[in-house]
Amino acid sequence: MFNKMRLKSALVEYKKRFIQTQWPDEKYKWEAVKCFQVNWDVNADDFAAMLTKALSQTGNLLASVNNFPAKMIIKFAEIAQEEVRAMFIELFDEGKDVYERVDSFKQKSNSLLERYGNGAAQHYQYENAICTYLWLRYPDKYYIYKLTEIKAVSNELESDYTFKKGAYADNIRNFFAFYNEICDELKQDEELKNMLASQITGTCYPDPELNAHILEAAKRNHITVKPVKVHSSDVFY
């Protein structure tokens, strides 16, 4: 549960600047999803080359200062192709619990680092990166996970979900439940859906149902919920 009036207030501000400000900055996320969808082939003979193409437009979603998850998982795929292929097959297996899949991917990355890291201190395959892989594969179901932003959104909307550092399983499960609730509200906003439809181009992941807008079109194009400071309050995009 959360304060729906606070969400509506945030959306009023968001819609005022979506086309001129938000979309130009965030369009690349829709393009990253389409790039992944077009190039992903779990059975590719050269899995590392395929993965490189699939992740080629993710930009800062999978690379930032001192954080290089895309580069590292591609390196592992070059060295241990079948192990990494199996990791993604398991991660994308919707018949299994999502947290168990995320945790398994992380633990297997630890093993890869120990054996093939060549002295590297990090594998960078943590909840943020792993949920991003899930989002790229299933953009109508998953979201990008950033704990500090999730906590900010939860506080701003006065939700009854709790997020605590180190509580990995509860955080992941509460995160998806919370954002799904927000999506349910956004899908009722026709103005949001129309705004998104007016901006989608051929380079973007298509959104045939136009179910929502801000949360990555609430399960379609994916733009995920993320706080932006506007008049000292968090708005979502």
Q: Residue spans of the language-model regions?
A:
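An N-terminal alpha-helical hairpin/helix-loop-helix interaction module that forms a charged
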Residues: 1-123, 139-237
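Contiguous, well-ordered alpha-helical segments that form the cores/surfaces of helical PPI scaffolds
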Residues: 130-137
